Regions:
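Generic cytosolic/nucleocytoplasmic N-terminal low-complexity/intrinsically disordered segments
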Residues: 1-3, 19, 63, 85
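N-terminal [4Fe-4S]-dependent radical SAM core
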Residues: 1-11, 26, 54-55
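Short glycine/proline-enriched loop/turn "hinge" motifs that connect secondary-structure elements
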Residues: 4, 15, 150-152
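Structural motif
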Residues: 7-9, 21, 94
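Alpha/beta-hydrolase
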Residues: 12-14, 124
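Local cysteine-cluster metal-coordination motifs and their immediate loop/turn environment
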Residues: 15-28
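Conserved non-cysteine loop/helix-boundary elements of the Radical SAM core domain that shape
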Residues: 28-54, 58-159
Length: 159
């Protein structure tokens, strides 16, 4: 962190998920590919329109939702690329992605890492499959464990 710059933290809302969980109060829900593309275009335009902040330095970016891992990994990569073109990032900026174990695979995780994500929050919610069903989750505890291992293998060391 450059001592002369003010720390800046960014939140990027990705409102899409596979299906809305019974307990979720966030603005989110399933969306078509066309809706996701339209949202991406609006998000990129919003970043373009944001004020230049040469006196600030990004120390963290958090992608929440919804379930950011439910959308195409390329979309998140393009958003990160746009953010990096607009803002100054600290060398050790924390870039976090919220994820559902039922939406992760090795290819997506490698794309996230390549795009600069260095932290992932994988929502397990419970280690009991029956509870996961009651909560409306789309994964099992075994799928969470597999996703955790895949995230580590992809180089995401903060899981």
């Amino acid at each position: 962190m450059n001592k002369k710059r003010k720390p800046l933290e960014l939140y990027v809302h990705i409102p899409f998920c596979i299906r809305k969980c019974a307990y979720c109060d966030f603005v989110s829900g399933p969306g078509t590919k066309a809706m996701q593309k339209e949202y991406e275009e609006a998000l990129l335009a919003e970043i373009d329109a944001a004020e230049e902040t040469a006196e600030s330095e990004v120390i963290s970016v958090f992608f929440g939702g919804g379930t950011p891992s439910a959308v195409d990994a390329g979309m998140l990569a393009r958003v990160m690329e746009k953010l990096r073109s607009k803002y100054i990032f600290s060398e050790d900026a924390e870039i976090t992605l919220e994820a559902n174990p039922g939406t992760l695979d090795a290819e997506k995780l490698k794309c996230y890492r390549k795009s600069g994500f260095n932290r992932i929050s994988i929502g397990c919610q419970s280690v009991h499959d029956e509870e996961l069903k009651r909560l409306g989750r789309i994964h099992t505890f075994a799928e969470f464990q597999e996703s955790f291992a895949l995230a580590r293998d992809a180089g995401l060391n903060v899981v």
